[in-house]
């Protein structure tokens, strides 16, 4: 290995601004950094000499980045895990396979990536120490496996084959593992369950360019026609939080409670549906809800709850179409999907990262994530653009609130729940840390076997 320098930082940022097909980070930077858009269009086949004009190396420890216009959230953008620094040599050696051979400055090195298994070995040259001066990381090896379903994953946990389960379905825990009392009595694995508010939102998307959802009254009727509290409490067994306000969850410095969201109002929903030409759901077209999940999952239960609420309250029949993410996205691109499950987890902790999803500039880009609903509002775009330039935190948050409130006013989507990030850990695993963006830090973990 070698020492990381400012040249490496510039190389990675240039790469992230490029038009190369394997670059997935362009949307974060190309409209923010001076010269990045021009570089993006010219670097489709290869990286160009000199890189982005707005990114300059001052010395071996300093890089300057010139923005197109002020953006106070830019430091948060740079925390995105996809902008982790890697050396030029790694890309030149592995090319399109570089993602399978990660090279960086982290606490672990990839030893194996095969089929459903990844093995990480300790990086003995890692630069970081803990507060007591102990060299990190403490673990010698981490093995990760992918299970076919959560039930088999939980059984592996019970059989002590794995020590950590992510995104656990609450309703399965006691059935598979038994109660906490049984664990304390030694009848099953001693474990702890941690739940953290996640900076993620689940919503259902509407095709704004297709009937019946090109009519805002139908979109509003669907939003008023469901009881989000009931769905969370009855169908999801309390997992997650109903979107009582806007689309953006609470983020440090931003309070979503200022946005007035949709609440159950069956009378208003029926009135709007009738005004749109579908009294009591009569003549409403056949509707499929594309859901990228498997039967029995929490997302399936959420979709089932919405389906049953729409039938009960609006007499609208919805057929669940369970599929892969790729199938869902392809159906949206072809215009076949009119109604689908969508979601977003923050790339970085800033409201702008949620709200930029619905900028009209993404229409026509065929993006599989950005503005799939084709929401088009000049007013929204103006508010969003103003928020990105604004330096005063209070004024900036006021603009975010106005954006989020406009998404509700126009019923751009059906906001449903802000998610929990629930993990289950063997009690012998100490110092496990995660954050609201569901990122994991293994560098401080150590194992302390229980005394017999």
Can you annotate each of these PLM segments?
Residues 66-84, 102-152, 173-200, 295:
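Aromatic-rich, solvent-exposed beta-strand/loop patch
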């Amino acid at each position: 290995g070698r020492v990381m320098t400012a040249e490496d930082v510039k190389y990675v940022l240039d790469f992230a601004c490029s038009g190369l097909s394997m670059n997935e980070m362009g949307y974060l930077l190309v409209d923010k950094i001076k010269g990045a858009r021009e570089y993006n269009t010219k670097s489709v086949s290869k990286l160009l000499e000199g890189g982005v004009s707005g990114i300059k190396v001052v010395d071996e420890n300093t890089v300057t980045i010139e923005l197109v216009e002020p953006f106070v959230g830019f430091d948060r953008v740079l925390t995105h895990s996809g902008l982790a620094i890697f050396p030029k040599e790694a890309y030149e050696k592995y090319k399109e396979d570089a993602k399978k051979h990660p090279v960086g400055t982290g606490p672990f090195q990839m030893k194996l990536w095969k089929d459903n298994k990844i093995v990480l070995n300790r990086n003995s040259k890692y630069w970081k120490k803990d507060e007591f001066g102990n060299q990190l990381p403490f673990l010698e090896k981490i093995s990760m496996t992918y299970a076919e379903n959560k039930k088999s994953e939980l059984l592996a946990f019970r059989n002590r084959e794995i020590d950590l389960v992510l995104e656990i379905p609450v309703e399965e825990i006691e059935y598979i593992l038994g109660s906490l009392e049984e664990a304390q009595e030694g009848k099953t694995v001693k474990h702890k369950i941690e739940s953290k508010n996640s900076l993620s939102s689940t919503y259902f998307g509407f095709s704004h360019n297709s009937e019946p959802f090109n009519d805002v009254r139908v979109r509003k009727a669907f939003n008023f026609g469901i009881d989000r509290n009931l769905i969370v409490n009855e169908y999801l067994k309390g997992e997650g939080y109903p979107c009582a306000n806007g689309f953006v969850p609470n983020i440090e410095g931003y309070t979503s409670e200022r946005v007035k969201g949709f609440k159950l109002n069956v009378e208003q929903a029926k009135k709007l549906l009738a005004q749109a030409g579908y009294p009591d759901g009569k003549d409403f077209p056949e509707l499929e809800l594309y859901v990228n999940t498997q039967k029995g999952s929490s997302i399936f239960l959420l979709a089932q709850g919405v389906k049953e609420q729409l039938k009960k309250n609006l007499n609208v029949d919805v057929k669940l179409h369970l599929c892969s993410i790729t199938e869902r996205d392809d159906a949206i691109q072809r215009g076949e999907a009119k109604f689908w499950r969508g979601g977003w987890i923050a790339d970085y902790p800033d409201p702008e990262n949620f709200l930029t999803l619905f900028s009209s500039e993404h229409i026509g880009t065929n993006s599989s994530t950005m503005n799939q609903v084709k929401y088009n509002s000049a007013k929204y775009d103006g508010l969003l653009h103003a928020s990105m330039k604004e330096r005063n935190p209070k004024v900036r948050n006021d603009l975010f609130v106005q954006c989020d409130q406009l998404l509700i006013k126009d019923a751009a989507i059906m906001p449903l729940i802000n998610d929990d990030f629930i993990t289950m850990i063997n009690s012998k695993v100490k110092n496990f840390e995660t954050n609201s963006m569901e990122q994991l830090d293994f560098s401080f973990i150590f194992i302390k076997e229980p005394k017999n």
